UniProtKB/Swiss-Prot annotation:
Comment block on domains: Displays high structural similarity to the ssDNA-binding domains of single-stranded binding protein (SSB). Unlike SSB binds ssDNA in a shallow groove on its surface where DNA contacts both monomers. The L45 loop (residues 82-89) plays a significant role in ssDNA binding. PriB's binding sites for PriA, DnaT and ssDNA overlap on the surface of PriB.
PTM entry text: An intersubunit disulfide bond is seen in some crystals.
Outcome of swapping residue 82 to A: 5-fold decrease in ssDNA-binding. Somewhat reduced PriA binding, does not stimulate PriA helicase, significantly reduced binding to DnaT and ssDNA, does not load DnaB replicative helicase
Keyword DNA-binding attached: yes
Gene that this polypeptide is encoded by: priB
GO BP annotations, alphabetical order: DNA replication initiation; DNA replication, synthesis of primer; plasmid maintenance; replication fork processing; response to radiation
Effect on the protein upon substituting residue 55 to A: No change in ssDNA binding, increased displacement of PriB from ssDNA by DnaT fragment, increased binding to DnaT fragment (residues 1-88). Complements a priB deletion in a priA300 mutant in vivo
Family affiliation: Belongs to the PriB family.
Listed name of the protein: Replication restart protein PriB
Gene3D superfamilies, alphabetized: Nucleic acid-binding proteins
Organism this protein belongs to: Escherichia coli (strain K12)
Domain of life assignment: Bacteria
Length: 104
């Protein structure tokens, strides 16, 4: 089964870094996406806020460059996480992160 998502946007919540009891580093943040997409011949506004988690040592170096306001593209897979309150939320598990040059 295919499960791939590529999403570009702006980091809107400060990254939270943790290390699991087994020593695996994790970085969590929220990515806000806004764009205009074409659907059925019409233009529509597309907007979402997607929680992102980066796990493992491979991508941790780039997470130290990510702050609120950073523009990035994230590639990975989606999965549901159950919160302590019992509600499920969709999360993007990042496998590749690219900083978008602001042009400054």
């Amino acid at each position: 089964m295919t499960n791939r998502l590529v999403l570009s946007g702006t980091v809107c919540r400060a990254p939270l870094r943790k290390v699991s009891p087994s020593g695996i580093p994790h970085c969590q943040f929220v990515l806000e996406h806004r764009s205009v997409q074409e659907e059925a011949g019409f233009h529509r506004q597309a907007w979402c806020q997607m929680p992102v988690i980066v796990s493992g040592h491979e991508n941790q170096a780039i997470t130290h460059s990510i702050t609120v306001g950073s523009r990035i593209t994230v590639q990975g897979f989606i999965s549901c996480h159950k919160a302590k309150n019992g509600l499920s939320k969709m999360v993007l598990h990042a496998e590749q992160i690219e900083l978008i040059d602001s042009g400054d």
